[in-house]
């Protein structure tokens, strides 16, 4: 009597995956991780990888899928050590407002006030300057070993984690995303994948519809305390031009509320001033 081993067929699995996407089915947390593993295995040509991104975008990413994608990317990133109370101040970008890099300015102010900040960022996409553009202009060396950044966070209370150094998996998708020229699930993943594995964040998103879902994703990923914010003016920031929509994650619960500049004792500003 002979037995026949059941051998996994990645190409067949990939075809089944793409059929599921074409039919509008959701993948869930584990399904998304499996999908990205298949797509990164070398068997998927760029056109299939692009079709996957578009299929998920057209249907709309679920919180479970975003969570699964973040887990996959986190499992493949280079990590750095940081104190338990470290925070990140970061945004998705993509708000097309053309403002200066507010989160980097906020990082400097927060660190000066005593917060421990492990700032994660990259170059500009739609703003006048990305975090790395600003810091490079200030003379900060970006391409330093993780141990140096870890020491800066511990000793100075602030360090910058330049995304390309810590996320080799993102590089394979970069030309595909550039060719598409559209927002995809990857626009959400950078802010969710801080190499210092912080559990406290202020995270700006480019759409009001993402505020509470991303707070839910952070809860699933183990964040302890976070604000997810979006300005009524379209900014992925706490805005000074009007209302900011906030979802606060704290101790496992999520609270939604609105803030105005007046709540913080600030005058209203304009987009042009920013």
Model-inferred region functions:
Residues 2-98, 113, 269-271:
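Acidic, glycine/proline-rich low-complexity segments that act as flexible tails and inter-domain linkers
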Residues 2-20, 26-27, 75-78, 99, ...:
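Glycine-rich anion-binding loops and their surrounding alpha/beta cores
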Residues 23, 41, 59, 90-93, ...:
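Short glycine-rich loop/turn motifs that provide flexible caps or phosphate-binding loops at active sites
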Residues 34, 68, 72, 108, ...:
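Alpha-helical scaffolding segments of alpha/beta enzyme cores, especially the outer helices
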Residues 48-49, 117-120, 228:
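Short beta-strand segments at enzyme active-site cores
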Residues 82-90, 118-124, 185-192:
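Core alpha/beta catalytic barrel or barrel-like domain that forms the active/cofactor pocket
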Residues 91, 95-152:
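A generic, well-ordered mixed alpha/beta core segment in the N-terminal half of proteins
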């Amino acid at each position: 009597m002979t037995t026949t081993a059941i051998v996994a067929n990645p190409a067949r699995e990939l075809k089944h995956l793409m059929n599921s996407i074409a039919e509008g089915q959701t993948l869930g947390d584990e399904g998304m991780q499996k999908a990205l593993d298949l797509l990164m295995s070398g068997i998927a040509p760029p056109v299939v990888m692009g079709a996957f991104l578009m299929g998920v975008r057209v249907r709309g990413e679920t919180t479970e899928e975003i969570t699964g994608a973040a887990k996959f990317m986190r499992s493949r990133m280079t990590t750095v050590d940081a104190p338990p109370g470290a925070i990140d101040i970061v945004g998705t970008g993509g708000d097309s407002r053309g403002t200066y890099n507010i989160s980097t300015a906020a990082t400097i102010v927060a660190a000066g006030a005593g917060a421990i900040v492990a700032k994660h960022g990259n170059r500009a996409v739609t703003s006048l300057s990305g975090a790395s553009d600003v810091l490079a202009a200030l003379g900060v060396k970006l391409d330093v070993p993780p141990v140096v950044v870890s020491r800066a966070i511990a000793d100075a209370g602030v360090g910058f984690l330049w995304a390309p150094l810590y996320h080799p998996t993102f590089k394979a998708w970069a030309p595909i995303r550039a060719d598409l020229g559209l927002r995809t699930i990857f626009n959400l993943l950078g802010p969710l994948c801080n190499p210092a594995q912080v559990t406290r964040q202020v995270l700006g998103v480019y759409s009001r519809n993402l505020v509470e879902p991303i707070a839910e994703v952070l809860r699933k990923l183990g964040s302890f305390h976070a604000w997810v914010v979006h300005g009524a003016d379209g900014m992925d920031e706490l805005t000074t031009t009007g209302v900011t929509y906030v979802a606060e994650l704290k101790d496992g619960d999520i609270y939604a509320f609105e803030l105005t500049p007046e709540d913080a004792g600030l005058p209203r500003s304009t987009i042009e001033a920013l």
